[in-house]
Amino acid sequence: MSDVSVLAHQLDRQRRRRLLLTAVLSCAVIAGIALDTHVVRTDAAGQTQQGFSPDSWAEQHFPEVKQSVERRAVAAQTLAAALQANQQAAAAQYGVGSPLPVIPVRLEGVVQPGEKGIFPLQVAGVPESLKVRLQTGPALSGTDLRDASGTIQFGDFTNQIEYQNAGAALNRAMKKSVLEKLDRNALPGKTVEVIGVFRLLNASNWLITPVSVEVK
């Protein structure tokens, strides 16, 4: 065999070794990626199989929120008078958060005919100009429950989406605990005892999200 043939044979063997080594390294990289890949599934409620579960979180925290609201709730008559006398001072005394505080309230009232699960309440001892409404679902608006205690902060969550989902999940947890047993069609004309919260958007218009409803 000539020197040229020997050299060509050696170069060919080196190329084959390099190709084999490249193939082995590529397989190792692909295997590593596969091992490090996690499949995340979502269900209809938007919960993740891994990571933050809004509804699980809410089931755990709603009892704490409820207890905080019930402990701090002020009678509607006292609150209405305080807001009428000095709204800023009343908000600072009874509310949580700013510039639109969430205020806990307790009241007894007669349910008036409503629409879409929102019922006006006739409450004795408050100004006639005060509009009090109770939202009972099935659709519940707002993040008043999330913000009611002052202990649930944005920094507790990874991002804004989790923070928003936590608020919606608290509404669902309350609905399951408090509202599922209500016969909405039978509410008008009934007297109810309510403990709940509302965001102070307008001192003369309270939309209450309940943590407790007792029909008498």
Stretches with model-predicted labels:
Residues 2-216:
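OB-fold and OB-like single-stranded nucleic-acid-recognition modules
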